Amino acid sequence: MATAGEESQTQAGRHQEVGHKSLLQSDALYQYILETSVYPREPEPMKELREITAKHPWNIMTTSADEGQFLNMLLKLINAKNTMEIGVFTGYSLLATALALPDDGKILAMDINRENYELGLPVIQKAGVADKIDFREGPALPILDQLIEDGKQGSFDFIFVDADKDNYLNYHKRLIELVKVGGLIGYDNTLWNGSVVAPPDAPLRKYVRYYRDFVLELNKALAADPRIEICMLPVGDGITLCRRIQLSI
């Protein structure tokens, strides 16, 4: 029978196996998903951008290929036309969105680093979807406040957030106003490398440990928000979909 110490070590070791490629505990199973249904159907521009991003020193920040495929299909299913993305990086998820939208679809994209976006921009332009994107460099909160001041409440069909986790709740307070009733907000990284269930003494990378409490706080708040229906999925690093069902509290 395992002792408490042995069990703690087992849990910590198990946590180390989770999250470095996906939340699946088997790399072989994740590779099977990628090689069977993701990579063979990945649009050529997305493949090119994924390979460019893989060479970036911060490549861990990119949306995974399976999540990109999921977002692309989701946007088609809900017939999204007017969308927003907070946190762009090199633009992999942005490209997945742009390819899914109709010719007159629009994406308001925000990131504090234009340089990373411009790394992927030639691929986006070659794919013929750059005209759908309105990129704004800088913090998102002032832009969101201005949208509300300009009367843009309820004007977005879909909003994807993959940015600074310590601001997720601040974003939510504003995005719930900007997404339409029946529209979706997708919060990325809501299982945060699996750390949301890691024991207190688990060996976590510094940035994972720092943002863990913010992710836990967000998850708790979303679960209690009566204005939305939610669905948390173990795709990529965890994504929580929030469907707005109520105008206000």
Swiss-Prot record:
Gene Ontology molecular functions: caffeoyl-CoA O-methyltransferase activity; metal ion binding
Superkingdom assignment? Eukaryota
Cofactors, names only: a divalent metal cation
Catalytic activities: (E)-caffeoyl-CoA + S-adenosyl-L-methionine = (E)-feruloyl-CoA + S-adenosyl-L-homocysteine + H(+)
Q: Which residues form a coiled coil?
A: none
Return the EC number. Answer: 2.1.1.104
Pathway membership, UniProt: Aromatic compound metabolism; phenylpropanoid biosynthesis
Query: Which parts of the sequence bind S-adenosyl-L-methionine?
Result: 63, 85, 87-88, 93, 111, 140, 164
**Chain's role:** Methylates caffeoyl-CoA to feruloyl-CoA and 5-hydroxyferuloyl-CoA to sinapoyl-CoA. Plays a role in the synthesis of feruloylated polysaccharides. Involved in the reinforcement of the plant cell wall. Also involved in the responding to wounding or pathogen challenge by the increased formation of cell wall-bound ferulic acid polymers.
Q: Give UniProt keywords alphabetically.
A: Lignin biosynthesis, Metal-binding, Methyltransferase, S-adenosyl-L-methionine, Transferase
Name the top EC class.
transferase
The subunit field of the Swiss-Prot or TrEMBL record says: Homodimer.
Q: Which GO terms describe its biological process?
A: lignin biosynthetic process; methylation
Describe the family membership recorded for this protein in Swiss-Prot or TrEMBL: Belongs to the class I-like SAM-binding methyltransferase superfamily. Cation-dependent O-methyltransferase family. CCoAMT subfamily.
Which parts of the sequence bind a divalent metal cation?
162, 188-189
Where substrate binds, per the record, is at 21, 162, 193
Gene3D superfamilies recorded: Vaccinia Virus protein VP39
Protein name per Swiss-Prot or TrEMBL: Caffeoyl-CoA O-methyltransferase
Note on cofactor: Binds 1 divalent metal cation per subunit.
Q: Provide the species name.
A: Eucalyptus gunnii
The UniProt entry, under Pfam families, shows: Methyltransf_3
